[in-house]
From Swiss-Prot:
Pfam families: GreA_GreB, GreA_GreB_N. Necessary for efficient RNA polymerase transcription elongation past template-encoded arresting sites. The arresting sites in DNA have the property of trapping a certain fraction of elongating RNA polymerases that pass through, resulting in locked ternary complexes. Cleavage of the nascent transcript by cleavage factors such as GreA or GreB allows the resumption of elongation from the new 3'terminus. GreA releases sequences of 2 to 3 nucleotides. GO terms for biological process: DNA-templated transcription elongation; regulation of DNA-templated transcription elongation. This is Transcription elongation factor GreA. Residues 1-26 form a coiled coil. InterPro entries: GreA/GreB_C_sf, TF_GreA/GreB_CS, Tscrpt_elong_fac_GreA, Tscrpt_elong_fac_GreA/B, Tscrpt_elong_fac_GreA/B_C, Tscrpt_elong_fac_GreA/B_fam, Tscrpt_elong_fac_GreA/B_N, Tscrpt_elong_fac_GreA/B_N_sf. Keywords: Coiled coil, DNA-binding, Transcription, Transcription regulation. The gene is greA. GO terms for molecular function: DNA binding; RNA polymerase binding. It comes from Nitrosococcus oceani (strain ATCC 19707 / BCRC 17464 / JCM 30415 / NCIMB 11848 / C-107). Belongs to the GreA/GreB family.
Length: 158
């Protein structure tokens, strides 16, 4: 199985979610099942069936998180060699050459990607175009509206 890149911060978030599911959510679901079971006939007990369904979702998510963490290659961004190149985990400030619009993205693994937080997947077209480039370099990104040209304004290793 291939290792999936994950920043230290992303791995910590997954660990926290896993801990929450195991120590808080799972016991609540077990209690809900026990309470619903106490109501009697299980065939027509909607509370029981809902609690069992929730238990299935929780257990599935726990398995997913454990699998993701077991197959993660955790990369501490602060320990990366700061040689001025764009690599996994860095934050890149870009300037659209045509519009002078600025954007900032952190390159993260697929599990952490969230455009609302300006985190883009290492497998995204823009990240693939950025990897290995240096500050001041220009890149071309194929977008639905056509090719967009960006200049790398800054690279941050935080």
């Amino acid at each position: 199985m291939n290792k999936v890149p994950l920043t230290e911060k992303g791995a910590q978030q997954l660990r926290e979610e896993l801990q929450e599911l195991k120590t808080v959510v799972r016991p609540k679901v077990v209690t809900a099942i026990a309470e619903a079971r106490a109501h009697g006939d299980l065939k027509e007990n909607a509370e029981y069936h809902a609690a069992r369904e929730e238990q299935g979702f929780v257990e599935g998510r726990i398995r997913d998180l454990e699998h993701q963490l077991a197959h993660a290659q955790i990369i501490d961004v602060s320990k990366l060699q700061k040689d001025g190149r764009v690599v996994f985990g860095v934050t890149v400030d870009l300037v659209n050459i045509e519009t002078d619009e600025e954007a900032s993205y952190q390159i993260v693994g697929d599990l952490e990607a969230n455009i609302k937080e300006n985190k883009i997947s290492i497998n995204s077209p823009i990240a693939r175009a950025l990897i290995g480039k240096r500050e001041g370099d220009e890149i071309q990104v194929q977008a639905p509206s056509g090719i967009i040209l960006y200049e790398i304004a800054a690279i941050g290793y935080q």
